[in-house]
From Swiss-Prot:
CDD domains (alphabetical): Ribosomal_S15p_S13e
Species lineage: Eukaryota, Viridiplantae, Streptophyta, Chlorokybophyceae, Chlorokybales
PROSITE patterns linked to this entry: RIBOSOMAL_S15
Gene encoding the protein: rps15
Subunit record text: Part of the 30S ribosomal subunit.
Places the protein is found: Plastid, Chloroplast
Organism for this UniProt entry: Chlorokybus atmophyticus (Soil alga)
UniProt similarity note: Belongs to the universal ribosomal protein uS15 family.
GO molecular function term, any single one: structural constituent of ribosome
Domain of life: Eukaryota
Protein's recorded name: Small ribosomal subunit protein uS15c
GO biological-process terms attached to the record: translation
Pfam assignment, any one: Ribosomal_S15
Length: 88
């Protein structure tokens, strides 16, 4: 999926490019792309580190969204097909 398509699908309003939902969707696309890359190149340690960084950023954004707007958080994780955060 292209970046523009993701932004259009998850934007809150027409000129929205940086809302939490859009950021999470873009990071999820990067996670999927990097995961596919690492299946073929499992010793690419720089990409593994990058994947862990992206996952951490996405986790922080999801945590923020779950506290700020739980309804849109639930909708977003179901739409993206990702697991909910563990409650500690």
């Amino acid at each position: 999926m292209s970046k523009k398509t993701l932004i259009n699908n998850y934007a809150i309003h027409t000129s929205d490019t940086g809302s939490t939902q859009v950021q999470v969707a873009l990071l999820t696309a990067k996670v999927i792309q990097l995961s596919q890359h690492l299946k073929n190149h499992n010793k690419d340690y720089a990409s593994q580190r990058g994947l862990r960084k992206i996952l951490g950023s996405r986790k922080q954004l999801l945590k923020y969204l779950s506290h700020k707007d739980p309804v849109s958080y639930q909708g977003l994780i179901s739409k993206l097909g990702i697991r909910a955060l563990r409650s500690n």
